[in-house]
Each structure stands twice: as C-alpha cells, then as structure tokens.
Amino acid sequence: MASHAAAKAPSRRRVHTRNRLLAAAYEVFAAEGFGRATVEKVCERAGFTRGAFYSNFTSLDELFLAMWEQRSAELLTDVRAALDEISVDGVTDVRAAVDGLLRAVPLDDAWFRITAEFTAHALRTPALRRVMAAREEAIVAALMPTVVAALARAGRTVADPVALGQALVAVHDGTAAQVLMEPDNAAVHRRRAELFCHVVLAYSTPNGG
C-alpha cells in the first residue's frame, strides 16, 4: 500500500505544480499583458524554478493553451448546469433562458484581456492560429449538444448546430467588449441578450414548423 501511494505522489505533485503555474500565469497575464509576460515572472509568482516550468510546459504559448482548455472545461460545466436548471416552454421563454444563462456565466474582464492579446499574437503566428481555430471548433462541438437539447425542450429544432455555434460565438465575442466597457449600462446588457435571442431563433425552428 505504501509503495503504491508513493508511486502516485509524484503525479499529484505534478498536477499541483501545473495548477500553480496556470494560476500564476493568469495573474501575470492579467496584470502585465501576455506580450510582457515571461517565464521568469510566472515562476516568480508561482514560487517555482524555471525547471519546474519547463517540466510542465515548453513555452508560454503552450501554457496559455492549457489555461484556455482548463477555463473552457469550466465554462462548459457552468453552461450545462445553467441550461439543465432552466425550464423552457416555447418560444416566449427563450429570452428567459438566455437571461438565466448570461447570469450564470458572467464575463471575466481579466480573461477577456488575456484572450484578446493572445488572439492578436496567434494571428501573427500561422501555426498557432490553426491550433486555436481547431480548439475553438472542438469547444463549440462539445457545447452544442447541450444547447440543442435545451432548445428541444423549448420545442425548437436546430438544423445546423455548427452554424448556430459559430453565430453564438460571434455574438459573444462581439458584445463582450461593450459590456465590459460599460458594465453598469443596462441597455448594453439588454442588447447583448436580445442579440443572443435573435440568433437562437434565427438558427432554430419550431418543432413541426
């Protein structure tokens, strides 16, 4: 038993180290920007050596992608939980479902800044751009079955889940900056919710319709 536990200990330590580095990187990226971040700054914030960093990640790019996957998994969990809790019954309740979902998954100012900077960095790096595009497609593909199921409970059918997913991402990305710039502006929040509703209704049809 003791030897079995000892064999597992390094794996647990590695997971702990990796999570500490991810948390430290989030703080460094948010405070200084991705472009100004360095491996040394991340290690200093985490309390680890460069060796600990390079035993887990090959670069800051790889670290960011791991962070993105981690936060995407958390987002998927939150969205699924929110949609499962929302009772929808017909078209008139789609807005209520959207409002509930937006409340359950609020925007993160720091994360928006981090992803905006990294996206600009990726656009200058073709290989990285392809990786980001593929991972975003995977995230949307993982999310859409939950969205489609929620709409089915509302009596609506989605003919093209991929198109709906891309449209929802576009609305999210396009309105996030407005909401974060004017967090207390009720009209901005209302328009964001209305745009989500318009997209959902445009890319779905009533059952039997």
Where in this protein do the model-derived segments appear?
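Hydrophobic/aromatic-rich alpha-helical bundle segments in the mid-to-C-terminal region
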Residues: R129-A133, A150-G209
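Short hydrophobic/aromatic patch on the recognition helix
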Residues: A46-F57
